[in-house]
Amino acid sequence: FAKGARRPNSQFLAAANPFVFGTFALYEGRSSYNLNQVSISHHFVELAGEQPGIYYGYYFLELADYFGQEGIDEKESMNLLYVTVKALLNPNIDNRLVRCIFELRMMAAQGLCPSLFHCVCCERQPVEGEELFFSQQNHGILDKACLGHVNDAKRISAPALYAMQYIVTASLGKLYTFTVTEEVLHELERHIHTYIAANTEKRFKSLEILEIMS
């Protein structure tokens, strides 16, 4: 809680707004943590004028909150949020791609990364040019020999797979430095959005608004 943050002269007034990045010092009360001190390093006030960029931002915050747990170091998630909000303000990258990148990287940060480098069944590393499939139920890629009775496997192209591999391994500083074709973006959306929905137990209100606005 930020006590008195709504007062015009409160030192916490700016810090209580969404999309404010900084260092927050808290003290533990009887039933909650209270804000004691804050040092703001960046205000993303320009995001408020971005449509539908701001709704992407709200969704990213809600998804991060879903995975956040009290007492757990969430530094990686916080830094991911920071570079992601900056990416929303970059006119050279599609917000739809930003969403795909954030969702998959967040899943990886939470230990829910799908198997993208080896067949999830036989653990064999695919060779270049090999036909591969992505299974939501099996949480990763399958080669043709391991399809068996898997009924949800969808073919995944080499560019889409490479993009997903890059997303889960790149440093945060280089995470939003690539683009893809519209065809590959559609494929990433199909695989990643479905994977998120299958591995979370919540219907995100901000996502519902985003889908209406987009």
Task: Describe each region flagged by the PLM.
Residues F1-S214:
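Non-catalytic alpha-helical scaffolds and adjoining flexible linkers that form interface surfaces
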